[in-house]
């Protein structure tokens, strides 16, 4: 099989319990923890507090797939100019962001370009550097922090990354502080919580109202305040800046020169198309004659037409593979409603792939009974990785064309009496 010709599409379906998804998102500090709610529904927490005499700004992005690296130039180039964070955010149509990696200050000109070290922006490699300390997100939206080579990045599937450091937290453990002693100053850091949410943090420094923090302080905040399991320091000083809700949030440590031109930034895309708040939703959704369960209350939902299309895809797929949504089983496992869906064009492509015709669905149904031999693997936690490879199809007499390699992760939670829940689809 020619792996270069394989197209991989990944979708994640997750039903979340009421206790996870209630409330609005704002931040209030206690001595040891944060109380979070969501008032505006943008799924981003905008949070500000004081830490040891320093002003700390934080954005918590609940969906890590929305976070990516934007660059001042769209393609790799040896020479050019960086741009300010607000200009970069507007260039990409981003709703939020922070500065990211450093740049090679050629001749001391302060041009903000090219980026230093390994840099990936939406899958494009902007640097020929072989290795270095990085902060990156792979295609499964997991954050990596620490030293990675270019080959490492390719092997683990890094989609977005910048080269800077030091790593502050790796796999839940704060890095040895003796390895990154620092003075007090303006700082930028990025981290990821265990639930996948991305934490972006900027600390003002070298100013009368905010003296700044050390690297060790950043690690403490990331772990003790935000619960990050991986985190990395980003470029600080005059580069430290945050953008949210159409404006710069913090103050540059160099008020005279203003914000610095940057080579890249961690940006946040808008909510996916189709995400809307719903005042009311139908009491039931019936697909193929099977009621998926009574729905009493929602906080967020997409429109009914899109919901029904996505439910049809989910039900057809699961019925073909497992029979979960047959007449006998529909009372035990059911999704309730979509929190958001992928853009309409992507949703249609995903459905077309899964439901190309009845022959494909029937073939899935007959070949997937033996899940170990036909690419359906239980992860042991209620989720399944469904992998259909070109090899499988090429061995079948039914196919006279090459089929794509598809990976689908499905997570089901048994909760027949739940009155509120979510079915979340991740972009792919």
Descriptions of predicted regions:
Residues 377-428:
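Exposed beta-sheet edge and beta->alpha loop/turn motif
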Residues 14-22:
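Hydrophobic core
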Residues 30-40, 99-180:
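Active-site-adjacent helix-turn-beta-strand microarchitecture at beta-sheet edges
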Residues 30-48, 276-309:
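N-terminal low-complexity, Pro/Thr/Ser-rich intrinsically disordered segments
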Residues 2-13:
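Bacterial N-terminal signal peptides that target proteins for export
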Residues 287-364:
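Core segments of small alpha/beta cavity-forming domains
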Residues 27-127:
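Zymogen propeptides
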Residues 107-129, 178-233, 239-281, 285:
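Conserved, well-ordered active-site substructure
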């Amino acid at each position: 099989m020619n792996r270069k010709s394989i197209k991989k599409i990944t979708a994640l379906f997750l039903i979340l319990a009421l206790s996870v998804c209630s409330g609005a998102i704002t931040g209030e500090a206690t001595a040891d923890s944060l109380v979070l709610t969501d008032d505006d529904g943008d799924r981003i927490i905008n949070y500000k507090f004081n830490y040891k005499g320093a002003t700390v700004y934080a954005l918590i992005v609940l969906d890590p797939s929305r976070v990516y690296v934007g660059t001042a130039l769209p393609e790799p180039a040896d020479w050019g100019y960086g741009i300010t964070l607000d200009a970069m955010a507007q260039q990409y149509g981003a709703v939020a962001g922070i500065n990211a990696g450093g740049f090679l200050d050629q001749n001391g000109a302060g041009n903000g370009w090219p980026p230093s070290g390994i840099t990936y922006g939406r899958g494009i490699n902007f640097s020929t550097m072989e290795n270095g300390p990085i902060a990156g997100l792979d295609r499964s939206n997991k954050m990596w922090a620490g030293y990675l080579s270019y080959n490492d990045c390719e092997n683990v599937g890094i989609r977005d990354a910048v080269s800077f450091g030091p790593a502050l937290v790796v796999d839940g453990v704060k890095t040895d502080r003796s390895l990154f002693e620092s003075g007090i100053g303006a700082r930028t850091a990025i981290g990821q919580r265990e639930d996948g949410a991305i934490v972006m943090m900027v600390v003002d420094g070298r100013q009368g109202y905010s003296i700044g923090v050390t690297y060790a302080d950043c690690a403490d905040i990331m772990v003790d305040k935000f619960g990050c399991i991986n985190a990395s320091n980003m470029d600080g000083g005059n580069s430290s800046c945050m953008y949210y809700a159409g404006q710069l949030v913090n103050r540059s440590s160099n008020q005279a020169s203003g914000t610095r031109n940057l080579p890249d930034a961690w940006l946040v895309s808008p909510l996916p198309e189709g995400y809307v708040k719903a005042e009311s939703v139908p009491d039931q959704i019936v697909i193929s004659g099977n009621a998926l369960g009574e729905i009493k209350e929602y906080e967020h939902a997409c429109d009914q037409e899109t919901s029904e299309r996505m439910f049809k895809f989910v039900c057809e797929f699961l019925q073909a593979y497992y029979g979960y949504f047959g007449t006998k089983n529909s009372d035990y496992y059911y999704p309730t409603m979509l929190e958001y869906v992928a853009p309409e064009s992507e949703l249609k492509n995903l459905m077309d792939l899964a439901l190309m015709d009845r022959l494909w669905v029937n073939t899935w149904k007959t070949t997937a009974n033996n899940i170990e031999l036909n690419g359906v693997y239980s992860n042991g936690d209620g989720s399944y990785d469904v992998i259909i490879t070109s090899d499988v199809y090429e061995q079948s007499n039914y196919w006279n064309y090459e089929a794509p390699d598809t990976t689908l992760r499905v997570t089901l939670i048994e909760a027949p009496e739940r009155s509120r829940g979510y079915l979340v689809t991740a972009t792919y």
